[in-house]
């Protein structure tokens, strides 16, 4: 299924290009193909550009959302305040600047709405089961980061045995899809900077610092809140003795879920991590260390072993 974050970018490029351009601009990705149509026709140039864009933001999209070009935002603010040439210093401008930054950066509120629209147009009618033991499986529990209803519709797994931790599609999931970074420290950092600027009566800095914090709040995914809201599912897992993880990159944003999962299940549980590439293998090794699993309690295996 075409459900990677790069597939999401392709969707935005086709159906919401203005939003995509605005968002990528926040991460120093310029839309040069708009300036010269020849770039779209030259596949080599386009492939090199796509590779650069992928590495800059989309390879680890959720983490990347918390790494906007803050320096550019701050420089932009400074140039505006300097152009005002205020005799009495940067005071009496906060409301005007707040309104301006809101107009500039509020667009990002539409991100999760576009995620929902993208997932709703993913078609499953050509999908076929790849693992027979999943079909009509009412013994295992499925903890999925995938927004689609493939487990419910293709494998016919009971909905009460599935947790779409980041939301999904109605009627299989009541919560809409969400994504975001997990860097709460960035938000706190800029709120503190805004407070200090306010104490120094520098309304220009106060305004832009709050604007940066607002941007990060709108792209933030509260993992603690996600887990607390779905506590009923986690409380069912006390007797789980085996955990198998496949198709996950073990990104920093989502590691708290696995830490909490370890807390909820049997202390003697065995873990299997399946990898597709050498990069996945290294990520699994890092996850094992972070989870503090003993050598005899886990295996790291090629993904082919899972599907056999």
Show where each model-derived region lies:
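SIR2/sirtuin-family catalytic core signature
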Residues: 1-3, 227-308
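Short, well-ordered beta-to-alpha junction loops that form the rim of enzyme active sites
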Residues: 145-148, 248
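Conserved catalytic core of sirtuin-type NAD+-dependent deacylases
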Residues: 1-45, 52, 141-144, 156-172, ...
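Short, charged, surface-exposed secondary-structure boundary motifs
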Residues: 171-181, 281-284, 308
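A short acidic-Thr-Gly-centered motif at the start of a beta-strand
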Residues: 124-139, 152-154, 231-238
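Acidic, metal/cofactor-coordinating or nucleic-acid-engaging core segments within structured domains
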Residues: 185-238
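Short, flexible loop segments at the rims of nucleotide/cofactor-binding pockets, characterized by
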Residues: 116-124, 219-226, 249-250
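Gly/serine-rich nucleotide phosphate-binding loop at the start of the catalytic core
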Residues: 1-138
């Amino acid at each position: 299924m075409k459900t990677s974050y790069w597939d999401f970018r392709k969707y935005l490029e086709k159906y919401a290009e203005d939003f995509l351009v605005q968002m990528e601009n926040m991460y120093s990705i310029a839309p040069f193909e708009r300036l010269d149509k020849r770039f779209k026709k030259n596949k080599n140039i386009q492939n090199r550009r796509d590779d650069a864009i992928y590495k800059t933001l989309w390879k680890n999209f959720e983490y990347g959302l918390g790494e906007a070009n803050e320096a550019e935002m701050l420089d932009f603010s400074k140039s505006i305040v300097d152009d005002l040439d205020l005799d009495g210093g940067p005071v009496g401008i906060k409301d005007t600047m707040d309104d301006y930054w809101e107009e500039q950066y509020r667009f990002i509120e539409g991100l999760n709405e576009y995620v929902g629209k993208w997932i709703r147009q993913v078609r499953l009618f050509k999908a076929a089961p790849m693992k027979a033991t999943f079909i009509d499986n009412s013994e295992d529990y499925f903890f999925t980061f995938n927004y689609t209803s493939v487990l419910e519709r293709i494998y016919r797994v009971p909905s009460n045995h599935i947790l779409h931790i980041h939301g999904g599609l109605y009627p299989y999931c009541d919560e809409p899809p969400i994504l975001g970074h997990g860097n709460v420290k960035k938000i706190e950092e800029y709120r503190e900077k805004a407070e200090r600027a306010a104490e120094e009566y520098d309304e220009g800095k106060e305004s832009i610092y709050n604007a940066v914090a607002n941007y990060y709040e709108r792209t933030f995914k509260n993992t603690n809140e996600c887990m607390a809201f779905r506590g009923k599912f986690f409380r069912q897992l006390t007797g789980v003795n085996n955990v198998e993880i496949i198709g996950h990159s073990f990104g920093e944003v989502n590691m708290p879920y696995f830490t909490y999962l370890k807390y909820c299940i049997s202390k003697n549980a065995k873990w299997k991590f399946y990898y597709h590439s050498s990069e996945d293998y290294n990520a699994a090794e890092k996850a094992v260390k972070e989870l503090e699993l003993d050598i005899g309690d886990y295996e790291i295996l090629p993904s082919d072993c899972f599907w056999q």
